[in-house]
Amino acid sequence: MNLKEKTRALFAEIFGYPATHTIQAPGRVNLIGEHTDYNDGFVLPCAIDYQTVISCAPRDDRTVRVIAADYDNQVDEFSLDAPIVTYDSQQWSNYVRGVVKHLQQRNNAFGGVDMVISGNVPQGAGLSSSASLEVAVGTVFQQLYHLPLDGAQIALNGQEAENQFVGCNCGIMDQLISALGKKDHALLIDCRTLGAKAVSMPKGVAVVIINSNFKRTLVGSEYNTRREQCETGARFFQQPALRDVSLEAFNAVASELDPVVAKRVRHVLSENARTVEAASALEKGDLQRMGQLMAESHASMRDDFEITVPQIDTLVDIVKATIGDQGGVRMTGGGFGGCVVALIPEDLVPAVRQAVAQQYEAKTGIKETFYVCKPSQGAGQC
């Protein structure tokens, strides 16, 4: 039974009437462009075929009822006429409540909804299960009540909910790719203008995601430290964001910066340039150049931004040794664990799977999880 069938069946069983709509919003993987989003830079993600699915129907009152199928059918119920506050003992509820609260501030022309939510985006793997949920909930209200909101506004609304209501700092990339993803394409996103350009993926290329299953512990505190270091760098150059600093300008005065801040700035500037070049390499089907850029990106995250861990570096080395120059591999996501992403010819997938299975656990004591994904469509009815 797929997620659509599962949520529709549960909806009818619990609420006693059929759902009118089923909405999906995908998770994502970022091919290149790491920690560039909050510096107003470029990212190159694609939506993946793992998603949050919500079966839903409008109500004729002002109540929102939510069932979380993946959490033993836990229930959340709240009124649109009372202040929406956090639900401290049920964390998933806060993503729903935050989205609805921020939607009210954007466009209050909607009423109550019944919904049943289920998803298969791996959690805690850096594949944006939370953004997928936020965009799915926003799309539910937009579709049921014909709200005049486009994908970018639904994405911004989800980001606001996560930053201000849930209390987790994040850039705009995760929500934007979930809302705007295009089948068989990656999107080159300008995080300043929110402009997105579809970049076709070469035929016969697989997007492989391997979760290191190394438990991320530092991610929150270190993420915020990296943001502060980048802001310090932008202030040094008297620019609103590192997006506005050229590598030439940086190289001329790098020795005057705090050495750690200088390394952080160099990563962001070089990563931005790599990301723009990667989009054109991908468009041309130049997997060899894409592989070089991904390797440079990983080295920069390891040495300049210092967000990889030995387990992730081991995974990257195993994959790289298997594929040579036929494609690329790098850490993806916030860092300190999580996943690596590889772009490889489909016929190399079995060899990569085998090499990782034979070597990763032997070297680290941790068993990986292996996903082969397709670049998928963004949020909408399913």
UniProtKB/Swiss-Prot annotation:
<dbReference type="InterPro" id="IPR006206">
    <property type="entry name" value="Mevalonate/galactokinase"/>
</dbReference>
<protein>
    <recommendedName>
        <fullName>Galactokinase</fullName>
        <ecNumber>2.7.1.6</ecNumber>
    </recommendedName>
</protein>
<keyword id="KW-0119">Carbohydrate metabolism</keyword>
<feature type="binding site">
    <location>
        <begin position="34"/>
        <end position="37"/>
    </location>
    <ligand>
        <name>substrate</name>
    </ligand>
</feature>
<dbReference type="Pfam" id="PF08544">
    <property type="entry name" value="GHMP_kinases_C"/>
</dbReference>
<dbReference type="InterPro" id="IPR000705">
    <property type="entry name" value="Galactokinase"/>
</dbReference>
<dbReference type="GO" id="GO:0004335">
    <property type="term" value="F:galactokinase activity"/>
</dbReference>
<feature type="binding site">
    <location>
        <position position="130"/>
    </location>
    <ligand>
        <name>Mg(2+)</name>
    </ligand>
</feature>
<keyword id="KW-0808">Transferase</keyword>
<dbReference type="InterPro" id="IPR014721">
    <property type="entry name" value="Ribsml_uS5_D2-typ_fold_subgr"/>
</dbReference>
<dbReference type="InterPro" id="IPR006204">
    <property type="entry name" value="GHMP_kinase_N_dom"/>
</dbReference>
<dbReference type="Pfam" id="PF00288">
    <property type="entry name" value="GHMP_kinases_N"/>
</dbReference>
<keyword id="KW-0067">ATP-binding</keyword>
<dbReference type="InterPro" id="IPR013750">
    <property type="entry name" value="GHMP_kinase_C_dom"/>
</dbReference>
<keyword id="KW-0299">Galactose metabolism</keyword>
<dbReference type="GO" id="GO:0005829">
    <property type="term" value="C:cytosol"/>
</dbReference>
<keyword id="KW-0479">Metal-binding</keyword>
<keyword id="KW-0418">Kinase</keyword>
<dbReference type="InterPro" id="IPR006203">
    <property type="entry name" value="GHMP_knse_ATP-bd_CS"/>
</dbReference>
<feature type="binding site">
    <location>
        <begin position="124"/>
        <end position="130"/>
    </location>
    <ligand>
        <name>ATP</name>
    </ligand>
</feature>
<dbReference type="GO" id="GO:0000287">
    <property type="term" value="F:magnesium ion binding"/>
</dbReference>
<feature type="binding site">
    <location>
        <position position="162"/>
    </location>
    <ligand>
        <name>Mg(2+)</name>
    </ligand>
</feature>
<keyword id="KW-0963">Cytoplasm</keyword>
<dbReference type="InterPro" id="IPR020568">
    <property type="entry name" value="Ribosomal_Su5_D2-typ_SF"/>
</dbReference>
<feature type="binding site">
    <location>
        <position position="223"/>
    </location>
    <ligand>
        <name>substrate</name>
    </ligand>
</feature>
<comment type="function">
    <text>Catalyzes the transfer of the gamma-phosphate of ATP to D-galactose to form alpha-D-galactose-1-phosphate (Gal-1-P).</text>
</comment>
<feature type="active site" description="Proton acceptor">
    <location>
        <position position="174"/>
    </location>
</feature>
<dbReference type="GO" id="GO:0006012">
    <property type="term" value="P:galactose metabolic process"/>
</dbReference>
<comment type="pathway">
    <text>Carbohydrate metabolism; galactose metabolism.</text>
</comment>
<dbReference type="InterPro" id="IPR022963">
    <property type="entry name" value="Galactokinase_bac"/>
</dbReference>
<feature type="site" description="Transition state stabilizer">
    <location>
        <position position="28"/>
    </location>
</feature>
<keyword id="KW-0547">Nucleotide-binding</keyword>
<dbReference type="InterPro" id="IPR019741">
    <property type="entry name" value="Galactokinase_CS"/>
</dbReference>
<dbReference type="GO" id="GO:0005524">
    <property type="term" value="F:ATP binding"/>
</dbReference>
<comment type="similarity">
    <text>Belongs to the GHMP kinase family. GalK subfamily.</text>
</comment>
<dbReference type="InterPro" id="IPR019539">
    <property type="entry name" value="GalKase_N"/>
</dbReference>
<keyword id="KW-0460">Magnesium</keyword>
<dbReference type="InterPro" id="IPR036554">
    <property type="entry name" value="GHMP_kinase_C_sf"/>
</dbReference>
<dbReference type="Pfam" id="PF10509">
    <property type="entry name" value="GalKase_gal_bdg"/>
</dbReference>
